Each structure stands twice: as structure tokens, then as C-alpha cells.
Regions:
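Anion-binding (especially nucleotide phosphate/pyrophosphate-binding) glycine-rich loop
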Residues: 1
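Accessory alpha-helical/coil subdomains and C-terminal extensions
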Residues: 4-5, 13-15, 22, 43-145, ...
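Acidic/polar active-site rim loop that often engages polyanionic ligands
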Residues: 26-39, 62-63
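Short gly/pro/ser/thr-enriched loop/turn and capping motifs at secondary-structure boundaries
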Residues: 29-34, 100-102, 153-156
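Short beta-strand elements at the ligand-binding edges of bilobed clamshell
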Residues: 36-47, 158-165
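Catalytic, metal-anchored helix/loop core of enzyme active sites in primary metabolism
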Residues: 139, 144, 151-170
Length: 171
């Protein structure tokens, strides 16, 4: 049996192996949180999907002078948010591993706006809080047009990056 998946799938594979079933487990999760791996199957594809969304949202945010809170997957791990937030030039990245104060965040956004930055992108891992609630507070406290975008399951699909296609093609 070949099992491709995250923690739950690989735990199930382990149970099968304990019963004597021949099992091969491949780490496949967009969270990239399987111990002993550098990158899991699906992580790079998810990062590219999120980065594409950030770039599109920056276009609309800058054109309309908005704050956009983008929620990405990551209940326990903020790696997707960190990697894509850095690559996409997010003003703030909120992850479950690091506590934050939404009032302080609002003050920082107001300060940036007053200093001439007319838009902000905030990337939020879902485990760090509710994008809808955080967006509402930011909008109320800053007086800026604040929108929320939740990518949801679109992050879990997509074409593999070119590197993987060529690396694993049978020649």
C-alpha cells in the first residue's frame, strides 16, 4: 500500500504496517509539517497558489487604498503564511505560533498609512484568529476600507510547479 498524506494518513499507514501490511508512506501536506522532511508534496504548489493571490490582491488593494486581510491555511503551523507573506511583501504576517494584539496591529497600519503607505496586505494563518473578526476590528479602528479574503480549499489544488514536472517525468 502506498499512502500519500499528512499526519492522519501516515498514522493510519503506521497502523497498517503494525498489522504486517507492506506500506510506503509519502509526506503529502500543504502545511509542510511532517517531521524529518524538508518539503512535503503539495507545499510548493500551495505556496505558488497563495503567492499568486497575494499579488492579485496587492493590485486591487493599491488601486483602491485598502487593507486586505488574506486568510490562508495553517491551523497549527504558520509556515505557509510566513513563506508567502515574505515573498509577497505583506505588511504583517499573523501565525498561531506568535501572539499578537489586534489593537497594536491597527495602530501600526494607521501609522503606515499616515506615513504614505496607502494600502496594506496582512497574511493570516487560520489558526491565528478569525480573518473576518480581525478585519472588522482593523476597519473600525483605522477608518480604512478593509476587506477580507479567505482562500480556503483552493490552496489544496493546482498544477505542480514546473520543477517537479520535469524532475519526475519518466524519460
Amino acid at each position: 500500500v502506498v499512502v500519500i498524506g499528512g499526519d492522519g494518513s501516515l498514522r493510519g499507514a503506521r497502523q497498517l504496517a503494525d498489522l504486517g501490511v507492506a506500506v510506503v508512506g509519502l509526506p503529502g501536506t500543504i502545511d509542510n509539517d511532517i517531521w524529518g522532511t524538508d518539503y512535503t508534496i503539495g507545499f510548493d504548489t500551495a505556496c505558488n497558489t497563495i503567492l499568486d493571490a497575494i499579488n492579485k490582491l496587492k493590485d486591487t488593494a493599491s488601486a483602491h487604498s485598502r487593507v486586505i486581510v488574506l486568510e490562508v491555511m495553517g491551523r497549527k503551523s504558520g509556515l505557509l503564511a510566513v513563506m508567502t507573506g515574505i515573498a509577497g511583501g505583506a505588511e504583517k504576517i499573523l501565525i498561531p505560533e506568535v501572539k499578537f494584539d489586534v489593537n497594536e496591529l491597527s495602530n501600526q497600519i494607521k501609522f503606515s498609512h499616515a506615513a504614505g503607505k496607502w494600502y496594506s496586505i496582512i497574511v493570516l494563518a487560520e489558526g491565528a484568529g478569525s480573518a473576518v473578526e480581525i478585519g472588522k476590528v482593523i476597519g473600525e479602528q483605522t477608518g480604512l476600507d478593509t476587506r477580507v479574503s479567505v482562500l480556503g480549499h483552493i490552496q489544496r489544488g493546482g498544477s505542480p510547479p514546473l520543477f517537479y514536472v520535469f524532475r519526475f517525468i519518466a524519460v
